[in-house]
Amino acid sequence: MKTVKEKKECQRLRKSAKTRRVTQRKPSSGPVCWLCLREPGDPEKLGEFLQKDNISVHYFCLILSSKLPQRGQSNRGFHGFLPEDIKKEAARASRKICFVCKKKGAAINCQKDQCLRNFHLPCGQERGCLSQFFGEYKSFCDKHRPTQNIQHGHVGEESCILCCEDLSQQSVENIQSPCCSQAIYHRKCIQKYAHTSAKHFFKCPQCNNRKEFPQEMLRMGIHIPDRDAAWELEPGAFSDLYQRYQHCDAPICLYEQGRDSFEDEGRWCLILCATCGSHGTHRDCSSLRSNSKKWECEECSPAAATDYIPENSGDIPCCSSTFHPEEHFCRDNTLEENPGLSWTDWPEPSLLEKPESSRGRRSYSWRSKGVRITNSCKKSK
């Protein structure tokens, strides 16, 4: 039987061993997040690092904190989260211990009933916790997180559709497509794809499904930004559209300095196609008048000469929706766990209404040089 001294020594050894297992954090050289005590990090995992009024927070830590209300307008504080509320939430989190790293400052708690686990967002991501970016923005620990019924025979036998590398042996690191059951992805690959394509271009890489696929990805904790795609936000992304076409496409160019040279005025002025703007010609190369400013290329001239519009042109589909700019985050407490209730419906094509057919016989008339022709073939001068 152990003595009291031996029991205390065993407890001390167990405590020291437990301390060594805790993730050691390097001393920070810059600002850290008030709600997870970490540095800026990867925006795809933690969101944008926001700094204002001597307060610095990760965007994801801000919207996922369990007791942080959004009481302000979108242009106040941090997307509607007021500084005084953030300070109160940081004070509350300072009393909560993370079940992963065993340190204080855990602002997120598991939303499962009777679960008392709290965790920092980065710690939870390392352990396999899951946070949902819709509705009430709930978070779950690794024991109570939503799961998928992925067939284990696929893991290790197939590769990720996006990166073409082998799938992870851990099911929490893989996500299965709801519309293409044979397609399985790495979680990090889907998150990177969602961060790049954003809401307006996010769809199934296999079948282009834009309804079930985004809803399932939201349920499985993928953050889909409500903004323009990353390639549209790059500086000078549309600079090519502002470049004027500068080439003569006439069959025989008569200009001595070549097809890529032209003058601002006169016979060697470059005239662009009035329909497409992607073809050009010198005035003399196409025998245009000195004051002519309108010209059409061979590809557009037949279409421009067509004046007849068929009666069933109303069957041509067109897009009836318009583009909406980025919207600010707003936490909705009325939505359930189904992401379809908070996911904006993707625009569907609509059909133009067919014009009502006129009753009776139609009357057509043409006027040319004083001659009037009607459907009864009567002529009068």
Swiss-Prot record:
Protein known as: E3 ubiquitin-protein ligase PHF7
Zn finger (RING-type) location: 160-208
Binding sites annotated in the UniProt record for Zn(2+) 3: C110, C115, C141, H144
Organism of this sequence: Homo sapiens (Human)
SMART domains: PHD
E.C. number: 2.3.2.27
Name of the gene: PHF7
PROSITE patterns recorded: EPHD, ZF_RING_2
PANTHER family, per database record: PHD FINGER PROTEIN (PTHR12420), PHD FINGER PROTEIN 7 (PTHR12420:SF47)
